Amino acid sequence: MSSPLASLSKTRKVPLESEPVNPGRRGIRIYGDEDEVDMVNDGQDSEEKISLPSCYGGIGRQGLMIHDSELLTSMARKLQELEQQLKARNEEMLSKEQKILALEDLVQTLQQHQSSTTREEELETQCIQLQRQVGEMERFLNDYGLQWVGEPMDQENSEGKIISESDERDWMKAKKFWKPGDSIVPPEVDFDRLLSSLQDLSELVVEGEAQVTPVPGGAQFRTLEPIPLKLYRNGIMMFDGPFRPFYDPYTQRCLRDILDGFFPSELQRLYPDGVPFKVSDLRNQVYPEDGLGPFPGEGRVVGRQKIRKVTDRVEETSGSRMTAEKFLNRLPKCVIRQGEVIDIRGPIRDTLQNCCPMPVRIQEIIVETPALASERQRTQESPNMPVPPLSMLRIKSENGEQAFLLMMRPEDTIGDVRNLLAQARDMDSAAFEILSTFPPTVYRDDTVTLQAAGLVPNATLLLRTRRVLPANPSFGTDSGPGSLP
């Protein structure tokens, strides 16, 4: 066994050129009994190879193994730190995604709330408007001494159901073929009670009594005529038609008003103070609802020679039908609203001319008079004041194509009427005469008042070209109203 001094005296071996040398490290090779150890210089990051004697055994290998374990530990620690950072980033991203989803839900909720708020405001506005309309209608009913009673909810639903079903039915199915509604028993009507109620209502209004009717610039008296009303087993017919079956909601409403002791609400506008009824009790007859009237020709029975008229159906509707002229005569000629004279019959006449044959229309001309101007001013300033006594004159022209409407005072004279007509016609007042047919009278005295001439409250007069009277004294000119020459 050699001593340490002997090992130091050995010659250092030079490394071979084939072995790669890292320029960044300076290796120290230690030799000793053919043992070599590579040591790393941490200060210069260079590897040095130092040859150690064999007496040091495996010291170099142990140092290299320690360095590798530290490197692995460091790499594992860094990898663990990176994994923790990645996990933290993932958790942060998930948290941000949840916040984004929550914000999106909040935005959607706010948008829905905004739309619902707008809808609530619209509904509130509509509710306020409907409440105001209901209040106005209740005040209107109170003005006539009426009160809204209402209807049961189930009855309203049934009426709406009937209306909707009738709208959906085809004409052929409704008029020609059997339908499920035909098997339903119509509502029972107490005819005796209905006739008694109609009689009581007619007694409230005296037949032939004059009522105040609005006319241009004021009002006039009009004689009431009873309304014809026919009672059939399956419905009623008011005026000259159309036929109204009992299952119709509007007919039921009309009958309900009568049975409750009120005039039908549908007649309120035309007859605000009521109207008498002329009832025809035809409860034993059934009015045909198929729209087919009696066969107009003659029929033959098979196997017989006898010719007979088909008259075994319901009786023909008696009386003349409602013509357009009759309908227009039931309407007021004109009304005054806010100081303006509004023609009522004119626009309706123009509409009816497209569908109904109308006679030659008479042009109605409203003449501006002092009484009309004062009445217009009164309606604007103090409409609640009573209407003063007035006289409404309707004067037809010579050819009958024009009719002049004049609102006059009872103290106005014939001369005032003549001057107003001459001014409206743009002609001389001496070129025409004013006369009445019943009694036949010519109004030549211009100083006579309308009250003295019997032209109050209204009258219908005619115009004619002035005639030259002969010189015979027996046909002298009257100083006032006289008989026709």
Curated annotation (Swiss-Prot):
- Report the record's Gene Ontology biological process terms: proteasome-mediated ubiquitin-dependent protein catabolic process
Q: Which Pfam families match?
A: SEP (PF08059), UBX (PF00789)
Keywords tagged on the record: Coiled coil, Cytoplasm, Cytoskeleton, Phosphoprotein
Show the segment(s) annotated as Disordered.
1-26
- Where, per UniProt, does this protein localize? Cytoplasm, Cytoskeleton
Key word NADP present: no
GO molecular-function annotation terms?
Answer: ubiquitin binding
Q: Which Cys pairs are S-S linked?
A: none
Q: What is this protein called?
A: UBX domain-containing protein 11
Origin species, per record, is Rattus norvegicus
Q: What is the lineage of its organism?
A: Eukaryota, Metazoa, Chordata, Craniata, Vertebrata
